Amino acid sequence: MDFINLNKVYPKDSYPLPKIDKLVDATAGYALLSFMDAFAGYHQIPLCPKVQEKTAFITDCGLHYHRVMSFSLRNAGATYQRLVNKLFEPLIGQTMEVYVGDMIVKSTVEEDHSSDLQKTFEILRAFNIKLNLKKYVFGVR
């Protein structure tokens, strides 16, 4: 789907993405790290009806529109980052770092890692966020 024209007229969301080098630095010195990736992260965010209308397209079967965010929408990255920052706010900087759909759970003490992961999974479950089962690594030293 080509959203070039829609992206031209839609105002840019200037919500900042985290700096990768700062995220890497924020994981230094931890006993255990776990890496996870949201499964088709953008497609897990429903679009409001007003925005859905703007994504309409015609096929042989009639008029259709996107019900979930598309990767190619101008503000997809900023919207997703704002969402995960809000959802994981109590954990970010403490036991977790998030860059769009990529999540790192970090523990200073190995014995706390299961508990730190559990808190993350509880939030993921509460908001029905699915993980990519092909893109995860748990318990990296």
Question: What residue ranges belong to the model's regions?
Answer:
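Retroelement reverse transcriptase polymerase core
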Residues: M1-R141
